[in-house]
Amino acid sequence: MFRGASAINLDTKGRIAIPVRYREPLQLEHQGRIVITVDIQSACLLLYPIHEWELIEAKLLKLSDTDKTQRSLKRLLLGYAHEVELDGNGRILLPPPLRQYANLDKRIMLVGQLNKFELWDEQSWLQQIDECLETIRSEELASNERLADFSL
């Protein structure tokens, strides 16, 4: 399970180093293989360990090729999907189209989301956090059926 936000850098070759604490689980459980694709709701990237991505692919396979919305979803997620492998230094290469989609520059945030990571431009991440806090503060959580029993 992946959790926490890590500030990392994009090097001049378009690579990022995965934080050390995640490398061993990625190597042991997923052979260092990661699939990167776009987030369809935010300008960030999603990084899935290979076995988690295979679950997504199984769901995508069940979607219709004749329904416009379902086909569009498949086209975006699979069209941008790019499999990478951790190198000996724990780095992965982010392809240029994916970097452009998420407006990634030198300073990046890698954010654990349990079964995957989100990859954000640092400034976009800070804006996203502000938006999330505003949303949570403006809503009555008890009125949300899924959050009614949630407590910290």
UniProtKB/Swiss-Prot annotation:
GO terms for biological process: negative regulation of DNA-templated transcription initiation. Keywords: Cytoplasm, DNA-binding, Repeat, Transcription, Transcription regulation. PROSITE patterns: SPOVT_ABRB (PS51740). SUPFAM superfamilies: AbrB/MazE/MraZ-like. The keyword Cytoplasm applies. InterPro entries: MraZ, MraZ_C, MraZ_dom, MraZ_N, MraZ_sf, SpoVT-AbrB_dom, SpoVT-AbrB_sf. Residues 5-52, 81-124 form the SpoVT-AbrB domain. GO terms for cellular component: cytoplasm; nucleoid. One of its GO terms (molecular function) is DNA-binding transcription factor activity. It comes from the Bacteria. Pfam families: MraZ. It is found in: Cytoplasm, Nucleoid. Its main location: cytoplasm. The keyword Transcription applies. PANTHER family: TRANSCRIPTIONAL REGULATOR MRAZ (PTHR34701:SF1). Forms oligomers. This is Transcriptional regulator MraZ. It comes from Shewanella baltica (strain OS155 / ATCC BAA-1091).
